[in-house]
Amino acid sequence: MCIRDRDEMVQNYPSRILYEEKADIYGVAVKLLTDLDWVDENWRRNFYAMSDRIRSHARLYVTFNKEYPENSVYYDPFTKTAFLFNFDYYGWIKSIALSLAGDVLEDEHGIYSIHGACVDVDGLGAVILGASGAGKTTHTYGLMRREKVRVIADDWFFVRGEENLLAFSSEKNFYIRADIASIWPEYKMLVEKAQFDNKGRAIVDLRWVVGKYRILPFTTLKKTIILIRDQNEPRIIIR
């Protein structure tokens, strides 16, 4: 969308805005503007809060409007402003917020986004990649049962550097599935205390189970693991 269309949409919003929250996503101030209680609540649980003294670098408007199709997204790359209409899944909303931060970081600072999980094992970082449903999150929480494993991110993180790549976390708390405890019983308490949405997911504080010292802000990447869910793949390491 162009700046003119963006300005017209912004002018139509003031009466709808009930919540304004700025998230600190690796130093980028992404501002949420919404009239939806559940979006505001998940947002505040999900991200670190940015100081009110910091002006926003990107903006995300989220609301319901019958004039637009389901899951509609309009984006102005010049002002880093996104409009989301008729979303009922928070996972997509947070992914777009992370994308906005990634757009700012890549354009202005040469810092790149990776959609994947990142863990630290004895001081060495490993990135876990794979298509949707490959098991990135499941394997991450499985690895976290080991005391020497610490987590940077289970879904999205940022990378910078040349010879030595540094991975940085993007979220304060994680968005888990309700079935995680049926796979790894160690997380039963976490699931019992969580408030799950209509998609069977919830923002939770993993520190309740693993402790605050096993959630790291960054690590040095040394290994890459690519998960492929294909029984016919000839390069299978573990079946």
PLM features: residue spans?
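Flexible phosphate/Mg2+-sensing switch loops adjacent to catalytic phosphate-binding sites
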Residues: 151-157
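Glycine-rich phosphate-binding P-loop
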Residues: 123-146, 151
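A noncatalytic interaction/capping subdomain that flanks phosphate/NTP-handling catalytic cores
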Residues: 4-127, 146-147, 158-239
